[in-house]
Amino acid sequence: KPAVLDVQIKRMLKAPKVAALTENFAGQWLMLRNIRSLSPDTGTFRTWDEPLRAAIIRESELFFEHVVQEDRSVLEFLDADYTFVNDRLSYHYGIPNVRGREFRKVKLPDDHRGGVVTQASVLLVTSNPNRTSPVKRGKWVYENILGLTAPPPAPDVPQLEETQLKGTLRQRMEQHRSNPACATCHAKLDPLGFGLENFDAIGKWRDKDEGHAIDASGVLPDGAKFDGPAQMRKVLLAKADLFRRCLAEKLLTFALGRGLEYY
């Protein structure tokens, strides 16, 4: 009976074993496992340290557990007015009045962040050691939020030459995208990643990139436009059905231990 099944599912989600779902499923979906091996450039990001690495991972784990165990809407993965921080992460995020190593649920003080897309874990794992990567960030949103399949990069396409191109990272990437061989992938992915350019490579908020004002405008694959991470979250919420399907497919793939087949 559905009512009995519902009771049993809620009981299971309250059990300590749900930690395994967090470690394994969230570890894959949010790429939390990868963070342990990342090495951000400490010359560029002088505030980076091991306590911050641990806090970044723990925030996303606690957030995922809260949504699951408290039977919250899955749409809070896209946008929420709260998160979980300790003193180290609150300093990184600019959230005042948080003291001590213990994590606690806090209300976010502004609309800069909300949901997993703007958590430092996702922002860090989709960046390069010394700078952000709009294409990596865009690809993550494209595949893990919208549930779409990103086209493979064209063969023999040269990497972005940092020393030859000028301006903000966005401007340099637009010059790079002028190469027709690069345009196919980048035209789909870059506009999503640009919406997160207000966050540096370790997930800290910024208004400028090397002295230049940041242009965080972008567009979804269907043409929906946004300007900045707050608007980006709103247009993603408008695609709620895509996200629900994406998350359901990923959970089913995780449960089965294999990819899904359609007949």
Functional labels for PLM-detected ranges:
Residues 258-263:
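Short, intrinsically disordered, charge-balanced linker/junction segments flanking boundaries
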Residues 1-253:
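Active-site substrate-binding loop specific to GH73 endo-beta-N-acetylglucosaminidase modules
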